[in-house]
């Protein structure tokens, strides 16, 4: 290993850049649909050795000394995000005549921007760099801090945070309930980077030993949590049977204005009233995916009547739909990406609007500035939705409370409002047909499962196509429908975890972990400087 590390440290020029990109790309193999988490060990071991060799000339100024570390981290991030997000381009090819021009922005521009976070993470790590275990702690500190920033800066886009690579199965997800995905990220980077210590004799034993202890604790807590007794279904309330519908409608058909909207509506209704499989109990709650209603529901009384005709009086339909708010004479109405609750009489009895919109998909950020600069193509992207000021808990007639997250709202661990403490389950409606049968829908589903584990709540997830599923409070898949399959699954709503940890506690543990690895890095750095002097 010492010979290999020496070769990596000394590699230079084009080969060095290519190796950094390759190291980042290898890490994506740890994410869905592959789930080969061992790839992260290769990825981060190479990154440590590359940063070992990220040295500037003796005459370089302060910024000049940091530039090699930044470029190494940026190239690593570019490889990671291109390999992990290339599927975003699929959405632009659905209407290629209008949006193919934006393909390079999606598959190269966005990764180039996100890679800046990893470039800065590498700079922070290099400022605290030392030999031995200290540099492993410095890297964990840098990545942990920058993944936290990536979760909210510039509207936030925490997709594929490194911690997800350490959670391919429920056994390895349970730590997220205590320290969150960001806390897992910090510890995962330390463990993934620890094999780099095999390339040097300095700090090998304590560094590898600590990494083994962290990994052992991660697995041990997972085993412990999965064997805890479950709470009664839905906190002691009558446990309803939930039907999750996946219509698997091609995105081209949904976007075609000439498509038969009634046929789309009929498909949802037909799947909703099918008899239970194997003679099971009739569903009490039926869930349709994001924007399942192909028209403005409040303007279509006939649709509500048809829903009432198909549902029993005590059944509930929850569906994604576009909601329109009339702003008065002469003022453009506002459109919201929403979830409706409809009772068996066809009455809308509850609703919640999306609060975190997709930039350049549901709205155009800095629209006025872009228009002023003459960037017309960007300003003319589809969108036009308004963001709700707050998220509304959905309370059903039987007292069950659902916490609604529409589409990619579920990827934001730090945006759960206090109302989630009252919820019996997380409701996620989405439409991953935009991305085809690529890694995207599977990555999205993993993040949804981890939210369920973090919150200690079961997850009800309905996708137009993607992965529709019922997941228990420990992230275990109870029932599901694969990508591009049409159908439904019925599941009885289960309970939350025995002891739900509050988000504020998870955040405290995250900062405690950041502080500990930062302290290890600083102490090691001080010792390194004293030895050099």
UniProtKB/Swiss-Prot annotation:
<keyword id="KW-0472">Membrane</keyword>
<feature type="transmembrane region" description="Helical">
    <location>
        <begin position="74"/>
        <end position="94"/>
    </location>
</feature>
<feature type="active site" description="Proton acceptor">
    <location>
        <position position="290"/>
    </location>
</feature>
<feature type="transmembrane region" description="Helical">
    <location>
        <begin position="17"/>
        <end position="37"/>
    </location>
</feature>
<comment type="function">
    <text>Catalyzes the phospholipid dependent N-acylation of the N-terminal cysteine of apolipoprotein, the last step in lipoprotein maturation.</text>
</comment>
<dbReference type="GO" id="GO:0042158">
    <property type="term" value="P:lipoprotein biosynthetic process"/>
</dbReference>
<feature type="active site">
    <location>
        <position position="354"/>
    </location>
</feature>
<dbReference type="InterPro" id="IPR003010">
    <property type="entry name" value="C-N_Hydrolase"/>
</dbReference>
<feature type="transmembrane region" description="Helical">
    <location>
        <begin position="105"/>
        <end position="125"/>
    </location>
</feature>
<keyword id="KW-0997">Cell inner membrane</keyword>
<dbReference type="Pfam" id="PF00795">
    <property type="entry name" value="CN_hydrolase"/>
</dbReference>
<dbReference type="GO" id="GO:0005886">
    <property type="term" value="C:plasma membrane"/>
</dbReference>
<keyword id="KW-0808">Transferase</keyword>
<feature type="active site" description="Nucleophile">
    <location>
        <position position="407"/>
    </location>
</feature>
<dbReference type="GO" id="GO:0016410">
    <property type="term" value="F:N-acyltransferase activity"/>
</dbReference>
<protein>
    <recommendedName>
        <fullName>Apolipoprotein N-acyltransferase</fullName>
        <ecNumber>2.3.1.269</ecNumber>
    </recommendedName>
</protein>
<feature type="transmembrane region" description="Helical">
    <location>
        <begin position="509"/>
        <end position="529"/>
    </location>
</feature>
<dbReference type="InterPro" id="IPR045378">
    <property type="entry name" value="LNT_N"/>
</dbReference>
<dbReference type="InterPro" id="IPR036526">
    <property type="entry name" value="C-N_Hydrolase_sf"/>
</dbReference>
<keyword id="KW-1133">Transmembrane helix</keyword>
<feature type="transmembrane region" description="Helical">
    <location>
        <begin position="205"/>
        <end position="225"/>
    </location>
</feature>
<keyword id="KW-0012">Acyltransferase</keyword>
<keyword id="KW-1003">Cell membrane</keyword>
<feature type="transmembrane region" description="Helical">
    <location>
        <begin position="127"/>
        <end position="147"/>
    </location>
</feature>
<keyword id="KW-0812">Transmembrane</keyword>
<feature type="transmembrane region" description="Helical">
    <location>
        <begin position="178"/>
        <end position="198"/>
    </location>
</feature>
<dbReference type="Pfam" id="PF20154">
    <property type="entry name" value="LNT_N"/>
</dbReference>
<feature type="domain" description="CN hydrolase">
    <location>
        <begin position="245"/>
        <end position="495"/>
    </location>
</feature>
<comment type="pathway">
    <text>Protein modification; lipoprotein biosynthesis (N-acyl transfer).</text>
</comment>
<dbReference type="InterPro" id="IPR004563">
    <property type="entry name" value="Apolipo_AcylTrfase"/>
</dbReference>
<comment type="similarity">
    <text>Belongs to the CN hydrolase family. Apolipoprotein N-acyltransferase subfamily.</text>
</comment>
